[in-house]
């Protein structure tokens, strides 16, 4: 077996050049790949959040007690967002937070497009810039809807990066307020290297 390192965001386009590839959902879904149909192996997801590669939302250490940021995290950890992840990202993204899997879902195949198309106004709201990677970030529209429904007066502005290491740099420099493309393993390594 010959292993060839390739940038994660280019993996789907190289499938014709290799016998197989390890591609995460961030890049597989926009390319039209479906795990149950196209995968040779699917990594088992640990829904209790113990998987060190589950994405988490992080802020700078100085901002760890910021109430606005905590409100965003709380909005992300809602039943509506869990349902959106499950319905919109078939087989690819799973909530790594508690939700009621047995509940009658309000998000369905028939109305998920309404959330994908949800638009909010940033007028008179606190704008929070959230760093993301890849093309699968529509769950943030569901988060925005939760915030708007709660009258939180917060507007989420997504800042998209094309490489996984760039959001950390942008967070550290203050270009973004939160990094939503961060896993525990990478965060621990980055903290060990950069403090």
Tell what function each PLM region has.
Residues 2-13, 158-169:
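Short helix-initiation/N-cap motifs at beta->coil->alpha
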Residues 12, 69, 73, 82, ...:
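Extracytoplasmic/secreted envelope proteins and their assembly/folding machinery
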Residues 18-19, 23-29, 135, 162-164, ...:
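Beta->alpha turn/N-cap motifs
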Residues 31-44, 189-195:
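Ligand-binding "clamshell"
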Residues 52-71:
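A bilobed periplasmic-binding-protein/Venus flytrap-type ligand-binding module shared by bacterial periplasmic
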Residues 75-99:
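Periplasmic-binding protein-like
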Residues 103-130, 148:
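Immediate post-signal peptide segment of exported/extracytoplasmic ligand-binding proteins
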Residues 130-157, 165-166:
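Short, polar/charged alpha-helical segment
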């Amino acid at each position: 077996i010959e292993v060839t390192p390739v940038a994660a965001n280019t993996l789907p386009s190289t499938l014709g050049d290799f016998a197989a590839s390890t591609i995460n959902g961030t890049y597989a879904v926009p390319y039209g790949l479906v795990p149950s149909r196209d995968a040779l192996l699917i990594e088992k997801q640990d829904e209790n959040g113990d998987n060190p590669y589950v994405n988490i939302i992080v802020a700078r250490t100085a901002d760890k007690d910021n109430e606005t940021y905590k409100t965003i995290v709380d909005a992300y950890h809602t039943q509506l967002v869990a349902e959106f992840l499950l319905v919109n990202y078939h087989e690819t993204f799973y909530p790594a937070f508690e939700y009621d899997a047995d509940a009658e879902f309000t998000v369905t195949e028939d109305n998920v497009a309404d959330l994908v198309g949800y638009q909010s106004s940033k007028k008179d709201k606190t704008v929070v810039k959230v760093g993301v990677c890849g093309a699968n970030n529509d769950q943030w529209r569901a988060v925005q809807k939760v915030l708007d429904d709660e009258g939180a007066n917060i507007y989420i502005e997504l800042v998209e990066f094309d490489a996984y290491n760039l959001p950390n740099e942008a967070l550290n420099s203050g270009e973004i307020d939160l990094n939503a493309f961060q896993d525990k393993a990478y965060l621990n390594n980055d903290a060990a290297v950069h403090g």
